[in-house]
Amino acid sequence: MSKLTNCILNKDPSCVPVWFMRQAGRYLPEFRDIRSKNKDFIKLCLNSNLSSEITLQPLKRFNLDAAIIFSDILMVPFGLGQDVKFEKDKGPVLSSFNLKRFFENDKNNFVKKLNPIYKAIETTKMNLSADKSLISFIGAPWTLIIYMFGLKIDKNQIDLNKLQRSEEEVKIVLEKIIKYLCIHIEKQIKAGADTVQIFDSWAGLIPEEKISEYCFEPNRKIVKFCKENKIPVICFPKGLKKRNSDFVNIVSPDCLSLDYDTDPVWARENLHNVCLQGGMDPKVLFKNKREILKETDRYLNIFKDRPYIFNLGHGLLPETNPDMLYEVVERVNNFK
């Protein structure tokens, strides 16, 4: 059993696994080299050999406990027929959502379009040390709907009136997305993934009266599916803050990933019967070595004697110095 799996499932606090969101990314010169030759991000995600190579890059530099497959949460909307492009300074841009075309999707076509991802997982698993975990991931239904419907986020706020769709239509689309996310998870597990992380990046924008319908229930259904398939599941509902307590009680993830706005002391005292992950602000890594290690130690000591995975409160930023990340990884691995 890998260190990560032992921590998540057995709630073993005796050692602290370490990995990072976006650990295979733009802060690494070897990634930038591949990216410079592959301008189309979606095509890069669908290149099984390159995807696997990128996935393994950080493990060649750092003593990490897990690889996370190089892909994107928007590969599911792509598999469901929407065009997905990443424009400089604008981020992801999707073609207009067409309800009729959305419901014309079938499992075989969806799986065929995303098959290179599953091949990349198979290749990565073959080249990954047996003591390392292989994490696959999905975007939560609410977060995907924001992109699929083309909703604009302004100053971390969203106007649900701009959904321009009936509540019934949103509900039907949510259920359909859940179905295809479970198909995607199942295929990733069969390919060799041994852990799943669910990114609900925009959970914090959901109004209180809709939090159960748009966040808790969709995540609960997917977590239930993961547990039925005996796969450890990590949830990252960004922006929930103290609503994380309700999330844990209702959704019952094996592990909850904390964002950088969540007070770690509050999390330690209020989130029970769940492994915790992350929390440290990625911008801490822009500071000097002494300050970086001081904050690393703070998180390690706050969660001492709790099942805890060291990570950040969001993905690694492109400006991150790999040398500083190396120092953090060594600090975690030497923590007693």
Question: Residue ranges of each PLM-predicted region?
Answer:
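N-terminal basic, low-complexity leaders that serve as flexible interaction/assembly modules and, when applicable
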Residues: 1-86, 221, 323-336
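A short acidic, glycine/proline-enriched capping/turn motif at secondary-structure boundaries
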Residues: 73-76, 91-92, 141-143
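Short, flexible, mixed-charge acidic loops at enzyme active sites
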Residues: 31-33, 82-94, 147-159, 271
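Glycine-rich, proline-tolerant flexible connector loops at the mouths of alpha/beta enzymes
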Residues: 68-85, 98, 103-110, 193-211, ...
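Active-site loop segments of alpha/beta catalytic cores
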Residues: 113-336
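Short, basic, glycine/proline-bearing loop/turn elements
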Residues: 33-45, 99-110, 249
